Amino acid sequence: MWVKVCGIRDTAMATALAGLPEADRPDAVGLNFFSGSRRCVDLRTAESIVAVLGKSGESGESGKSSKSIEAVGLFVDAPLDQVVSRQRELQLGTLQLHGDETPEYVAELQQACGGVRLLRAIRVGDSGLGEWGSYLQRCTELGVEFDGCLVDARVEGQFGGTGESPPWSLLASDYRGEVWPPLLLAGGLRPDNVGRAIGEVSPAGVDTAGGVENEDGEMDLEAVVQFVRNARAAAGQSRGETDG
């Protein structure tokens, strides 16, 4: 189960996450470069966070190395050259597109950033997946390969991060996992409901932002740990795994 937390904004939290036992760490954190978001980070801060996270897999006192926490760059309808510049400056291995980027835009981005992994955020409401099927088909025709579709709630005028949940039952029945990229579930996920969401939707991964923030809107380390633990425990149960 791939677990990501989005909206990290300072090196103090990056250091805290990097210091966690590997089992309690998220696989990835999101660096939000959308200026319209309260979670937006500037380039200098992002550079510092990436540097800290890059050391999270280094050998400790035990002499054993572990997997580093990955930094994912999140963009919303940003100019192509800006995304390419950020990707190269920060050596980002994964980019998350959260706006209304066209298939043609994505194809050009993939060509410019050869080898980068792409996540496509899609916003879904009660009306269903609608146009996203044709969107993904057009991307395929252009040679675009997404590594995941991050499914969030459709909220008019918003690009995500609203705390609302997409219709889980609809995703469970209508998401064409055999044809489309792996489903990464987002939207309204918290430590207390991520297990139920995984049980109902069976996603390949989960993502949260507000679900692990405190009342002041700051990322809460304890909530992150609980979210990661609950997500991985639920994923193990859904595969029929048992302890021991």
Can you name each region flagged by the protein language model?
Residues 14, 46, 83-84, 106, ...:
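Generic hydrophobic/aromatic pocket-lining and core-packing "Φ" positions
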Residues 45-53, 108-109, 209-244:
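C-terminal helical cap(s) of enzyme catalytic domains, especially alpha/beta-barrels
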